Amino acid sequence: EYFYARLYNLISTFGGTRMVLTIAPGDATAKALCETLDETFQLSVKKNLRSGYGKCLNVTDRINTAMGANPFVFQVVEAGCPVETSAPQKATDAVSSFKSAVNKARGAALCGIDIGGTDIKVVGIQGGHVVAVKEYDWNPAEMTSIDQVIEPVLLMARVIRSAMSLPQTAEAEQLKTEMLKKGVSDDAMRSAADTVSALYGKPLLLDGIGVCFPDVVIDDMIVGGETLKTRGIRAHSPDYDKEFPRLAELKRMLLKQCRAGGVVHMSNDGSLAAYTAAVELAHSEHAETVRDGVFAHTLGTELGTGWIDETGEIPQIPLEVYNCVIDLGNYPARAFDPMDVRSVNNFN
C-alpha cells in the first residue's frame, strides 16, 4: 500500500506519459509487485469507472490528450539501478523576474479574473491603478454543463471592460455602481453593458486578461476535470470527456475582448497565489527570501498549492497536492466521509 501511495502521489504531482521502474535482476518480490500496477491503477478502465489509485490517471491522461501525447503507461525494467548524479546548481535570480513582470504591466489595460468555488472576483487595472472591482457569487459544483461555467466568466470580462471605459461623470458613475454592485442579475449586467455601448461607444479592448482557475492548468489550458467544482458536470454529462475539453476554448473566447496583440494567460489559482506572494515579497525588504522561488498553500473551497521555481516561472505540472495520500496509518479516520474534517479521504 505504501508503494502504491508513493506512485499515486508522484503521478498526482508531476503527471507524465510514462513511469519507468527499475528493479534488480532476480528480485521476484519487486517484479511481482510491479506487475500489479496496471490493474491497481486501472490503466485499461474507462475514466468514469476508475476509483481509488486509478483516479490520478484521469487528470494525467487528459493532460496528455491535450498535449497530443499518448496515455500514461508503466514500464518495468530489470537492470542495475542507475547511479543518481546531481548537476551543478546554477545561480538563480527569481527576484529580477518578479520585478520585471510588474514593470511590463505598467500602463497596460488589464483584467484579472479569480475563479473560485463560491465566487468570481474580477479587477480592472489602468495605468497601474485599480479602476473597477466586481464580485460574482456562483456555485460551479452544482452546474451541469460547461456553458454554465464559461458564460459568467465572459460576462465578467465584458462588465469590467465596460466599467473601465466610462467617463468620470455623475451619470456614468451611477451606471458603473449599478453594474459592479454585488448580487445584480446577469440580465441586468448585460443590459448595463449594452447601455454603456449605446451611450459611450464600444468599450476599450484590453491589453491582457489573466485568469486563475481552480483546476489543473497546463499551457493556458484547463485540463484537469476531477475537482469538486466540476462534480455536477461529471455527474450529468453523458460524455464528460467530450464536454470538459470545451473549457480549453475559454482562452480563445477571452482573446476577443483584447486588442490585436493582446494576451490571455491562465493558471491554477494556487499557482497564482504563490506568484502574487512572490511578487509582493520581491518588492519588499524581504526580497531575498524568494530568490530561489516560492511554495505556497491556499485555503479556499479546497486546499490549493502553488510552486514558483527558481527562474520565477510556474512549472507546467499538475501539482495536485490536495489529492496526495498523506496518512496511510490512520485507519479510524478512513471511516469518515471526505467532507468531514476528521477524514483523511478526499472526495475522489
Residue spans for each PLM region:
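Juxta-kinase regulatory segment immediately upstream of eukaryotic protein kinase catalytic domains
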Residues: 69-100
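Short linear interaction motifs
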Residues: 90-108, 189-193
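Gly/Thr-rich phosphate-binding beta-strand-loop-beta motif of the actin/hexokinase/Hsp70
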Residues: 98-132, 296-312
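Active-site rim beta-loop-alpha module in soluble metabolic enzymes
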Residues: 335-348
